[in-house]
Structures are given as C-alpha cells and as structure tokens.
Amino acid sequence: MWTVPPLLIVLVAAAYPLLRVCLESTKVGDTQRGWSTWSEVLASPMFRDALWRTVSIAVTSTAGCLVLGMFLAIVLAFVPFPGSRVVGRLIDTVLALPSFLITLAFTFLYGSAGAVNAAISSLTGATSSALNFLYTPVGVIAAEITFFTPFVVRPLLASFAVLPRPQLDVAASLGASPLRVLRSIVMPEAWPALMAGGSLVLLLTLNEFGIVLFTGAKGVITLPVLIYTRGIVTFDLPGAAVIATVQIALSLMLYGLYRMVFARLMSGRGRGDADVVVEPAK
C-alpha cells in the first residue's frame, strides 16, 4: 500500500505530461488525429540537421568531459598540491550554477568584445576579433565541457575515495610505475563511476537548451532549440510535440542502453572480481 502514493505522484507529475505531449503530436487540425504531422516533421531537412547536430554535439561534449574529468579527478585525488581543496570546492560550486551563467562568462571572456580578444588586440594592434569560435558549434561544445565536467569529476572522486590506499602503496613498493598502478588498480574501480558520470553528461547535453540559446551560435539548431522555435515562436504545438516525442524516445533509449551496459559490467565484475596482483619490478 505504501508504494501506491509515490507511484501516483510519478504518474501525475511525469507520465501524464509526457503522454499528453505524445498525444499532441498526433493532432491534425482542431479535432482530428493522424500521422501527417509526423510525416511532415520527419521529412523536414531542418529536423534531420537538428537531430544530427544534437547527437554530434552531445557525443563530442561527453567525450571531452570524460577526458577532462578523468584528468582532474586523478590530479585532485592522487597528486596533492596547495589549493587542491579549494579547487574541489570550486568544482562543486559549478554544479549549483545554471548553465547560462557559463555561457555569459564565456561571452565576457571570448566574445567579440571580450577580455581575451581585447588583450590580443592591444598586443597585436588587430582591429578584428582574433577569436571567433564562441558563436560556432565549437563554442557550444567548449561551454558544455566547462559546465558538465564536474558531473564526471564528482563520481570519480567518490570512487577514488574508497580505494584501499594500502593496495596502492604495496603496488608502488613492488616497483609498479604510476601508469601501471593507474591501469591495473585505479581504472578497474573507476569504470562504474566513469560510466555513471558519462551517461549523465550525455543525457544532459542531449537535452541542453540554455547554453545553445545564450551563445546565439548561428546555424547551431538542436532539437531543444527546434522545439522552442516551433512551440513558442511559431506556435506550432503539434510539430513541437513530434520533435519532443523524438527527444523523449532518444533519451529513454540512451538511458536503457546505459542500464543494460552497466548491469553487464557489474555482473562481469562480480564473476571475475579478484585481488589485483602486481609483479615486482625486475
């Protein structure tokens, strides 16, 4: 009986609105229903371009977050330096900020009238902006990597915190190089956290709207931006609902794929879990 109230809350707060969106996508006119809106939207070159742009930006940003996040987490966890705790707190602070603030900061730094371009102009005497990447897909990807990397760093730091330090010390005392310790001991324990952070970043970048909108990047039309354009600007609610339904299906598919891969990874770890043996250096 205690499971009924939470289930009802989920159905009312999440499932019902999503169902209404899916039903709205089948509306034709005021009273009829059909699939003509689907055919029109899916055949549109703008939709196909937006779908490709959304997936490519999300995958590229996720890859960048994984590489940068792994590097930062390893440095913060295993390479002590003055101010490391402050850096960790700053990374946590980014998690509490809205995404458009990062874009605003990028505008002040790398925009056509930003601090970096002003400094370059003062040094070189150039009259045009030296950096123009902010208003391109590269600028969107850079802003997303900056904003979403902490979502990878935090799970990795939590995973590294529970690593048995004596095991690392023994491996080092036996002559294992830092790279071998990282590959043989650290990385196997970090895979679940890396997958969790990476899958979260992929879903977030796939549905990111604020960064793309605030950069004002020309030609960067993603699915969320296209939903906004058709639903709010042109007030084409059925067309926006079709794109939103595709977005929902894509997100659920990626989440299901993540759960399947994660379950197989954990079951494989359970079957083959054994102490790591590091041979002494010869």
Each language-model region and where it sits:
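Glycine-rich helix-loop "coupling/hinge" segments at transmembrane-helix boundaries
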Residues: K27-T31, F209-F235
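A short amphipathic helical element positioned immediately N-terminal to and/or at the very start
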Residues: R33-A43
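Membrane-water interface segments at the C-terminal ends of transmembrane alpha-helices
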Residues: M1-G29, P45-A161, E189, A193-F209, ...
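Glycine/proline-centered hinge or cleavage motifs at structural transition points of membrane proteins
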Residues: L174-A176, P188
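Short cytosolic juxtamembrane segments of multi-pass membrane proteins
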Residues: F262-K282
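The alpha-helix within a helix-turn-helix
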Residues: A171
